Amino acid sequence: MAARLPACVVDCGTGYTKLGYAGNTEPQFIIPSCIAIKESAKVGDQAQRRLMKGVDDLDFHIGDEAIDKPTYATKWPIRHGIVEDWDLMERFMEQIIFKYLRAEPEDHYFLLTEPPLNTPENREYTAEIMFESFNVPGLYIAVQAVLALAASWTSRQVGERTLTGTVIDSGDGVTHVIPVAEGYVIGSCIKHIPIAGRDITYFIQQLLRDREVGIPPEQSLETAKAVKEKFSYVCPDLVKEFSKYDTDGAKWIKQYMGVNAVSKKEFSIDVGYERFLGPEIFFHPEFANPDFTQPISEVVDEVIQNCPIDVRRPLYKNIVLSGGSTMFRDFGRRLQRDVKRTVDARLKLSEELSGGRLKPKPIDVQVITHHMQRYAVWFGGSMLASTPEFYQVCHTKKDYEEIGPSICRHNPVFGVMS
């Protein structure tokens, strides 16, 4: 067989889309998942409108270019991980393939990712776009959580390659806690947490707004985002952390320098409590969202307790982090400590209730962090799409023409998965 061109791996998220070729360790492009379109006035001569429609369809921009176009309407076709506008999504994919990857879609197999609990109909829509609009030879739709588990094999903490584990996937728009057993997601036990990267940015923006007057209002969001990415970390104890800043501020308070976009003058702000209060909303969500008060460690514990009893220990032993919002320093350590406390308290209680007759075996809680965390889903896809099995499990154009889009409702597990 002639040497194949590598597969294209595309991971579409709420905030950013990661894309590149299989076999690489990092995505070639990371672009905002938005599209800017010309919204022409809907009044006027119908014939004129019909003429313009074809032109308007070609007049659009995606990614960073879309954000820089003030005269266009900027749309985000994906909300909370799920595609909401398929027409825009098709145009978005068109530019991804031709402008960014510069690929001829007929020559490359494609691995696309989907969020947990994606509907079978959505898989069919994806198949229709890929096979009919782009004429791809083969398509595989992978669940993001399974790819994140595969990516965690690069960690030194992982002894054996397993596809059983609890994935905490926290991106820009949503955080999911997803239990996976032998490569299959336990759908009924998934929980989502309405706190993610964007909420942390908004919370830091609010804190800075209350305290710092020097930030230009139109730049307050990007300043908050920069502060979050540059200075934020997770602390082990809130009270001690506050006292650290109060007693020795010079050591802990950082300076952020920015440039006013209008006057081009520099401005500087002090970054203090915001450094640890931002990511703290994972563990104390009530700081930012009064309607949701369950810390992430409790959600993880509840998810695992809802799972079948025979997979609970392996799920505790392999808690895998994925996505940009899990990148805060010491996030994994704090999560491991909090989950361990909850688990140990439960074991102690069961021992007390049995009057000391039951001696429960301790449960090993391990949170896996690794250097591929930020793009874990994309990297997992890149690894699996460069294996020979990938081409055997892909749905081909021939299958699609024979059976129809329903073939993409089911995508077999493969690799070390099986």
From Swiss-Prot:
GO cellular component terms attached to this protein's record: Arp2/3 protein complex; cell projection; cytoplasm; nucleus; site of double-strand break
Swiss-Prot/TrEMBL keywords: Actin-binding, ATP-binding, Cell projection, Cytoplasm, Cytoskeleton, Nucleotide-binding, Nucleus
SMART domains: ACTIN
PROSITE patterns xrefs: ACTINS_ACT_LIKE
GO terms under biological process: Arp2/3 complex-mediated actin nucleation
InterPro entries with a match to the protein in the record: Actin, Actin/actin-like_CS, ATPase_NBD
One Pfam family of this chain: Actin
Keyword Membrane applies: no
Sample GO molecular function, one term: ATP binding
Subcellular location: Cytoplasm, Cytoskeleton; Cell projection; Nucleus
Domain of life assignment: Eukaryota
Keyword Cytoplasm: yes
Complex formation: Component of the Arp2/3 complex composed of actr2/arp2, actr3/arp3, arpc1 (arpc1a or arpc1b), arpc2, arpc3, arpc4 and arpc5.
Family designation: Belongs to the actin family. ARP3 subfamily.
Role, per record: ATP-binding component of the Arp2/3 complex, a multiprotein complex that mediates actin polymerization upon stimulation by nucleation-promoting factor (NPF). The Arp2/3 complex mediates the formation of branched actin networks in the cytoplasm, providing the force for cell motility. Seems to contact the pointed end of the daughter actin filament. In addition to its role in the cytoplasmic cytoskeleton, the Arp2/3 complex also promotes actin polymerization in the nucleus, thereby regulating gene transcription and repair of damaged DNA.
Protein name: Actin-related protein 3-A
Species this protein is from: Xenopus laevis (African clawed frog)
